């Protein structure tokens, strides 16, 4: 009988502690809640200074997080055809890390010329893996529009002038 009472009490304490933990989880950390609700909850917990800091870069390609709320830094990178090697915070020179290297993929016009969506998927997966390895949160590319003018200095980041071809090649790239 004592054993049953002890097991019952233990089960009650365990259930109560699990229930209390789930109630204490902030809405912004609850993956089951809608994104809009999570964003509103996170914003309501942030100070004005923290909000301003998040929309103002702390260096090239980086915005600070809010460590007290568990919100990580945001790291961006150029790279619709390869992840940029690390650069110095105060100038555009390469950081010169001896353990730093990157894969330079062919420009997206070359990828589009293959007319191969499976290749675009593999290309996107490869870039995504390198971005994750380098702890990059946002990839600045690819350009998903079509060429509008030959004078656009970023045309190499697009997949050409043909909207049909672009749509067939960009989607698997992004999914990758």
Model-identified regions with their sequence ranges:
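N-terminal beta-rich core of secreted/periplasmic extracellular enzymes
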Residues: 21-176
């Amino acid at each position: 009988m004592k054993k049953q009472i002890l097991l019952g009490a233990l089960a009650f304490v365990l259930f109560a502690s699990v229930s209390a933990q789930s109630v204490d989880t902030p809405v912004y950390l609850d993956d089951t809640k809608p994104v809009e609700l999570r964003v509103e909850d996170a914003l309501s917990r942030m100070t004005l200074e923290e909000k301003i800091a998040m929309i103002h870069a702390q260096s090239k390609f980086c915005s600070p997080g809010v460590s007290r709320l568990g919100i990580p830094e945001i790291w961006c990178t150029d790279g619709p055809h390869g992840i940029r090697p690390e650069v110095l915070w105060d100038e555009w020179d390469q950081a010169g890390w001896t353990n730093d290297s990157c894969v330079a993929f062919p420009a997206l016009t070359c990828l589009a010329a293959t007319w191969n969506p499976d290749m675009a998927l593999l290309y996107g997966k490869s870039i995504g893996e390198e971005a994750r390895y380098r702890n990059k949160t946002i990839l600045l590319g690819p350009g998903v529009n079509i060429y509008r003018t030959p004078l656009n200095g970023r045309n190499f980041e697009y997949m050409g002038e043909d909207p049909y071809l672009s749509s067939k090649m960009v989607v698997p790239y992004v999914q990758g």
